[in-house]
Amino acid sequence: MKKLLILGCLLASFAGFAQNEESLKEAELNRFKVMVAKDLPGLQAVLHKDLVYFHSSGVQDNKDSYIASVASGKSSYVAITPEEMQQRVYGKTGINTGILSILQQAADGSQTTIRLRFTDVFVYADK
């Protein structure tokens, strides 16, 4: 079984993850789905123990603090929509780049949409 680390914006793990562009894209889209669903067990499963996650604000989280922020509602995503995505795979390293439109919800229920560029670096490693 393989574990996938995403550095830069994220570290995550995906079992049986093939090292090609299409599966790299699927892994990224699955991560977005789990984040929007506030699926804490799903986040626990897909995020690597060495997660480094940088928010658009510059705030940095590790795995535990990121999952806690989702659980508390501090990080609350209503929708994550890729506008552009490009995948590159170099041996055991995969890079996703692109532009996202993210609909966020604040604790008071107000919603804002942010548009941002992202880079996620995936490194394939044994589990």
Language-model segment annotations:
Residues 4-7, 19-45, 50-127:
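A beta-strand edge to alpha-helix "cap/lid" segment located at domain peripheries
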Residues 10:
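Acidic/polar active-site rim loop that often engages polyanionic ligands
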Residues 13-15:
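N-terminal signal peptide c-region/cleavage motif recognized by signal peptidases
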